Swiss-Prot record:
The keyword Nucleus does not apply. Its main location: cytoplasm. Catalyzes the cleavage of L-kynurenine (L-Kyn) and L-3-hydroxykynurenine (L-3OHKyn) into anthranilic acid (AA) and 3-hydroxyanthranilic acid (3-OHAA), respectively. It is an enzyme of class 3 (hydrolase). Its cofactor is pyridoxal 5'-phosphate. The modification N6-(pyridoxal phosphate)lysine is found at residue 228. SUPFAM superfamilies: PLP-dependent transferases. One of its GO terms (cellular component) is cytoplasm. Belongs to the kynureninase family. This is Kynureninase. GO terms for biological process: 'de novo' NAD biosynthetic process from L-tryptophan; anthranilate metabolic process; L-kynurenine catabolic process; L-tryptophan catabolic process to kynurenine; quinolinate biosynthetic process. Homodimer.
Length: 436
């Protein structure tokens, strides 16, 4: 990122070279994105309604190749298990509506204590939808005293202890504050073996960050956004995964339901074949425009789409996914990512630019197998907003979360080792020199 104008930001009245380390919150715009979007805009301009079915990226099908590419290059799944559609929260609602099937005995959802608020709101709404009390339905995993991250040794006992009550497990692939990478394969196995329940994952901070193997890990479902590590633009189109073992039978004509009554004597109709919630784009494309009013579900994950994908957002994400393909996929990017984050950790902990131990605490696990690209530090003896603003004045863009967490992420697609070194110098200046 060469130049960024700060003139709209209070107290910063100059332009300079920027050190951008905030890809965990918003990825940068690829150089070719504007060119490609303008090309697609011209397609709409020149073809009008015909652009639904013709042109380089027909609007009605703009998600199809994108879904295939994301399945192959980003999450390692079968093509029929991935759909690029809607956004993370909507996709989560659609999948939770299918997989959260509370009964009198099993009605609880296992989550982390510091779950991302949006995910909490989704789960809370489904608990209430089924007529249950939220206070009775959440089992929360908490780190040990004076620790930031969850230990596998503490997750398994909690699953075993509550296996008779757990109806669903929902966790993040990578925790948004600490940057901790969860062992998705192992935890999914535990959920299946002991709680005998579906296990779902929020991959907002994992997709485009680390290699994923969703099919092979036997994950039931997952959702993600695309504006962070995938650089898909603000409010980018999201994605969902549903393992093929949960797919409805081919030729299924709409949802099939069973009726049961929960412990509050409320009658619930649950879909046992395909999505619980459907829409215009859940219908198979071959007969969608016959307008019969009879739902004919699309195959696999495509049945979990709701409406026509946004063409321009699909175009923006197409550019970004093609860049990842040109790099050889996530394994190559991860190799550089590990080196960048390891280098940053070395600089702030053991080099001549090391931060004083009483000025910070490293929150993210030091083991590269237990983290993604993000490195989070807890700042002591200084207001975190002041730290953020002082870094901003030096041209460093990262972000913070209250009460005192500074989140920094070297991105292999656009950060260099020199960037990381210059960042460490700025951190040293702000944290060490200011507090001396």
């Amino acid at each position: 990122m060469k130049i960024l104008q700060y003139k709209s930001i209070e107290n910063v009245q100059y332009s300079k070279n920027i050190l951008y380390f905030c890809g965990h919150s918003m990825g940068l715009q690829p150089k070719s994105t504007k060119i490609y979007i303008n090309k697609i805009l011209n397609q709409w301009k020149n073809l009008g309604v015909l652009s639904y079915h013709y042109g380089e990226l027909p609007a009605s099908y703009c998600d199809e190749q994108l879904s295939i590419d994301c399945a192959q290059w980003i999450v390692n799944a079968k093509f029929n298990e991935v759909s690029i559609t809607c956004n993370l929260t909507v996709n989560m609602h659609v999948l939770i509506a299918k997989f959260y099937r509370p009964t009198n005995e099993k009605y609880c959802i296992l989550i982390e204590n510091d779950i991302f608020p949006s995910d909490y709101y989704v789960l809370e709404s489904h608990i209430q939808w089924h007529g249950y009390n939220t206070n009775d339905c959440f089992i929360k995993l908490k780190p040990r005293l004076h620790e930031y991250c969850l230990r596998n040794d503490d997750i398994l006992p909690e699953i075993i202890k509550n296996q008779h009550r757990i109806a669903l497990i929902w966790l993040p692939g990578i925790q948004y504050i600490t940057g901790q990478l969860f062992n998705m394969k192992l935890i999914t196995e535990w959920g299946h073996q002991y709680a005998k329940c579906p296990v779902g994952w929020d991959l907002a901070h994992a997709v485009g960050n680390i290699p994923l193997y969703l099919h092979d890990w036997n994950i039931d479902m997952a959702v993600w956004c695309s504006y962070k590590y995938l650089n898909g633009s603000p409010g980018a189109i999201g994605g969902l995964f549903i393992h093929e073992k949960h797919h409805h039978e081919e030729g299924s004509y709409g949802p099939k339901f069973i009726e049961f009554t929960n412990n509050n004597n409320i009658t619930i109709f649950n879909n046992i074949n395909g999505p619980q919630l459907t829409g215009w784009w859940s219908h198979r494309s071959e007969t969608r425009f016959n307008m019969t009013g009879n739902m004919e579900l699309a195959k696999g994950a495509n049945a979990y789409r709701l409406s026509n994908p946004p063409l321009l957002l699909a175009a923006a994400l197409t550019v970004s996914v093609n860049i990842i393909k040109s790099c050889g996929g996530m394994i190559n990017l991860r190799e550089k990512s590990i080196k960048l984050t390891d280098y940053l950790e070395y600089l702030i902990t053991n080099s001549s630019l090391a931060l004083k131990h009483d000025h910070y605490c490293l929150v993210t696990p030091s083991n590269s197998n237990e983290r993604g690209a993000q490195l989070t530090i807890s700042v002591t003896h200084m207001n975190i907003q002041v730290v953020y603003e002082n870094l901003l004045k030096l041209g460093v863009i990262c972000d913070y979360r209250l009460p005192n967490f500074l989140r920094i992420t070297p991105i292999p697609l656009y950060n260099s080792f020199e960037d990381v070194y210059l960042l460490a110098k700025c951190l040293h200046q702000v944290l060490n020199d200011t507090l001396n």
